[in-house]
């Protein structure tokens, strides 16, 4: 293995220095075919995401899926692209979360960097930046409230790949998932209440939609569904809602396998026939708005619901760079720092 021999610009102080690393999924650099193709190729080549043997999966991916899908995905990204910053909302809000957390921790001398599992800015560059600021301890927060091998674990994998190339490694602490952390539930509760207060109608249901996962992953031991249940149970309790008033569903199914159910789209399209024509949708598995929230739910599902006879549809925004989001990240960071003392 070739080691990186670059010496950090600043040596750690005698007492040591801790830095915070935020890791999110990733995004194409733009909406063009080749940018989207590069991103999808990296994402769909991850064995944590697609567990099929590469000898079987890669020919399908490279010759079929990546020939056509970048066009459709690029058009979808274009609908939600942040024009002022020329970036996807996921990148914009992840950066703003890092900036907000950095401001909270500035007086403590704790720098904050952010990186993407797929695409730019890379996790390796974020680690390098923290070490250049004299950090010999890094606290990593994967921005996924509920654990899954397809998200949290692969983010950690990427962090440790970056460390594999360093001759002098910093000490690292990875923060566990936080599906029912009090600050997370408070932030979700506030987001729902603020959204409902601004509506001209009262939703008959608030549908909770989480990103789906193949059922086989759960059967093999992934705790994702259980953690989604923990989130929604705590949120229902905070809002005083029943299971019927806030049902749990799963979106974004891909491929022929059976995924965890109920599936969001069929569930929502069936509601008008049951007399439920006014709904809101919240996506508590996403820390920031992205393609799956703004387009798949905010555009596509809205259209399908209206075509099925729906009358009113509201989207509860993700936490993004809200005060509640920064409060949560600060709480997670400070708790981790308190337990991560220099030896």
From Swiss-Prot:
Binding site for Fe cation: 211, 292
EC number assigned by the record: 4.98.1.1
Disulfide bonds: none
Catalytic reactions of this protein: heme b + 2 H(+) = protoporphyrin IX + Fe(2+)
Enzyme class, first EC level, given as a word: lyase
PROSITE patterns listed in its UniProt record: FERROCHELATASE
Single GO MF annotation: metal ion binding
Membrane-spanning parts: none
Pfam families (UniProt xref): Ferrochelatase (PF00762)
Pathway assigned in UniProt: Porphyrin-containing compound metabolism; protoheme biosynthesis; protoheme from protoporphyrin-IX: step 1/1
Family membership: Belongs to the ferrochelatase family.
Protein name as annotated: Ferrochelatase
Organism name: Gluconobacter oxydans (strain 621H)
The gene coding this protein: hemH
């Amino acid at each position: 293995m070739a080691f990186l021999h670059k010496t950090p610009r600043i040596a750690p102080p005698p007492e040591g220095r801790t830095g915070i690393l935020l890791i999110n999924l990733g995004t194409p650099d733009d909406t063009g075919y080749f940018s989207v193709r590069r991103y999808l190729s990296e994402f769909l080549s991850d064995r944590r995401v697609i567990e099929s043997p590469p000898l079987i999966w890669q020919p399908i991916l490279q010759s079929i899926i990546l020939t056509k899908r970048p066009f459709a995905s690029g058009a979808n990204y274009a609908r939600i692209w942040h024009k002022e910053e020329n970036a996807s909302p996921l990148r914009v809000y992840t950066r703003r979360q890092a900036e907000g957390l950095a401001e909270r921790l500035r007086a403590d001398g704790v720098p904050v960097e952010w990186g993407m599992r797929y695409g730019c800015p890379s996790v390796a560059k974020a680690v390098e930046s923290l070490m250049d600021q004299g950090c010999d301890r890094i606290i990593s927060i994967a921005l996924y409230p509920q654990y899954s091998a397809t998200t949290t674990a692969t983010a950690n994998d990427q962090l440790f790949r970056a460390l594999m190339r360093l001759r002098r490694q910093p000490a690292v602490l990875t923060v566990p998932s936080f599906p029912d952390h009090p600050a997370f539930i408070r932030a979700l509760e506030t987001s729902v209440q603020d959204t409902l207060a601004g509506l001209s109608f009262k939703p008959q249901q608030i549908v909770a939609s989480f990103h789906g996962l193949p059922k086989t992953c759960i059967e093999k031991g992934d705790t994702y569904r259980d953690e989604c249940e923990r989130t929604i149970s705590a949120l229902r309790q905070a809002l005083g809602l029943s299971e019927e008033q806030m049902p749990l569903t799963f979106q974004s199914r891909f491929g022929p396998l059976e995924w965890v159910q109920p599936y969001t789209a069929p569930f929502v399209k069936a509601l008008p026939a049951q007399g439920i024509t006014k709904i809101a949708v919240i996506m508590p598995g996403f820390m920031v708005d992205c393609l799956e929230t703004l387009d798949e739910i905010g555009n596509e599902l809205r259209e399908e619901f209206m075509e099925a006879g729906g009358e009113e549809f509201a989207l509860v925004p993700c936490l993004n760079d809200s005060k509640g989001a920064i409060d949560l990240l600060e709480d997670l960071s400070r708790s981790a720092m308190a337990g991560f003392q220099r030896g």
